[in-house]
């Protein structure tokens, strides 16, 4: 009986520690959002509450709030360095409390994208900021904002990109850039089996379609709650621009049609390319 009581008391203390830790993680993640500019100060409480809902936590205790609030402010660089650790602890909590089906890379990517989606401004807000910067400052300022947002949102995973191997070599045709991309994770056997058995869906039709923006994902399709796209008019037709999450080269842009159409190179392709670089001359 005594041992049973001791075991219960230990379990209670362990649960309380985990409960306090997830509250700290939530506040630290919001602090990250504020430090990087992802979260507007006016949206701080709203963002905290969205994360509480996601983790099925009812409150932020006063002691936890004071502990995190009293921490020194973070620079952009400091915030970037803390994100991976914060998300790792959040996913540990999610798995241990039944919020994440498997503790594997595929399920972690699905869940941490869902977490980051709570911090990213709505598409209309991102597009308005982009247009304002383009019209009143410069095209460069607009793309700088959009690229930074794509990184800060963890859509472009900075910590994984750092693992890529890059070097140059001189050839008879000039200097050649060589990249070995290590940032795209390999699926584990369980995820491969789950993807094989998953219900097939034609939505979104491909990983570049506009319907990916905000999509929750599944084992055979990446989550995109933290993904934003910018509408463009190219050669009098509707297009979008986004950045590649794998960054095969600096500020790797993807410009795609608003309709799901086959990719092909034809005479009109070069006109579209010239129209794009006319609008964004710094990408020429």
Q: What are the roles of these predicted feature ranges?
A:
Residues 2-263, 283:
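Active-site microenvironments that recognize anionic phosphate/pyrophosphate groups
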Residues 265-281:
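Long, well-ordered alpha-helical scaffolding segments within enzyme catalytic domains
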């Amino acid at each position: 009986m005594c041992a049973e009581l001791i075991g219960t008391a230990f379990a209670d203390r362990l649960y309380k520690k985990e409960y306090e830790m997830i509250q700290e993680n939530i506040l630290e993640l919001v602090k990250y959002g504020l430090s990087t500019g992802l979260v507007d100060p006016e949206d701080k409480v709203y963002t905290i509450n969205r994360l509480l809902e996601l983790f099925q936590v009812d409150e932020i205790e006063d002691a936890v709030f004071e502990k995190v609030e009293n921490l020194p402010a973070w620079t952009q660089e400091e915030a970037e360095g803390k994100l991976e650790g914060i998300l790792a602890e959040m996913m540990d909590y999610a798995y241990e409390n039944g919020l994440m089906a498997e503790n594997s890379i595929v399920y972690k990517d699905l869940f941490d994208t869902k977490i980051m989606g709570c911090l990213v401004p709505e598409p209309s807000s991102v597009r308005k900021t982009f247009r304002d910067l383009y019209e009143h400052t410069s095209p460069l300022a607009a793309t700088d904002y959009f690229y930074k947002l794509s990184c800060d949102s963890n859509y472009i995973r900075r910590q994984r990109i750092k693992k890529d191997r890059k070097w140059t070599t001189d050839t008879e045709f000039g200097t050649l850039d060589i990249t070995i991309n290590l940032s795209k994770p390999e699926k584990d056997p369980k995820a491969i089996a789950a993807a094989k058995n998953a219900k097939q869906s034609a939505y979104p039709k491909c990983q570049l379609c506009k319907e990916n923006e905000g999509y929750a994902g599944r084992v055979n399709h990446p989550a995109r709650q933290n993904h934003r796209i910018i509408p463009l008019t190219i050669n009098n037709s509707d297009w979008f621009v986004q950045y590649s999450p794998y960054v095969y080269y600096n500020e790797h842009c993807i410009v795609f049609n608003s309709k799901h159409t086959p990719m092909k190179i034809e005479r009109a392709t070069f006109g579209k390319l010239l129209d794009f670089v006319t609008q964004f001359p710094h990408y020429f």
